[in-house]
Amino acid sequence: SVDPTPAPDPTPAPTPDPTPAPAPAPVPQGGQWISDSVGWWYRYADGSYPAGQAVRIGNSTYRFDARGYMRTGWVSEDGAWFYHDASGAQASGWVKDGSSWYYLDAATGRMVTGWLLDGLTWYYLMPGSGAMATGWVKDGSSWYFMAPSGALMTGWVKDGGFWYYLSTDSGAMYTGGHWIGWKWYYFNESGQWNG
């Protein structure tokens, strides 16, 4: 007969990691917004206030400078950029600042750079600034064309009096000879089709 009692596991129990997890931003248990000659700040019910940190108040995230004043506009934190509107609330999704559009991650609020798929449309956000690209963009060794709306173009595009063809799979500009449909086309090194 088989003994149904399991044998003890000889593997020692893992030791806990001595590094504590980072503390989450405090969630205020009541408080009020106060304005003075410098700006807005938030006072907790116990009289303390957040300073030099991001705090969730209600349904929005706010950032406070080292003195405790609410921040607005672009804020850099831990190598990432965030945008806070005039109310101080952290923005997410598409934001227009000046003449440029930016995209802020919906979950974290961080500014996105590089390729972004929003719905069914691809966009390119410049690596240095995060601004949405329009017109010609070079990424790696390939060229792409972004519409005035920022959307990645594919197929035939006419720009500056010349025709170009952008891959329907990747959007990359064609150079050299390619079959498109049932016809052979040749594109010079600049991607221009010379008809």
Summary of predicted features, one role per range:
Residues 1-195:
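Extracellular adhesion/carbohydrate-binding repeat motifs centered on closely spaced tryptophans
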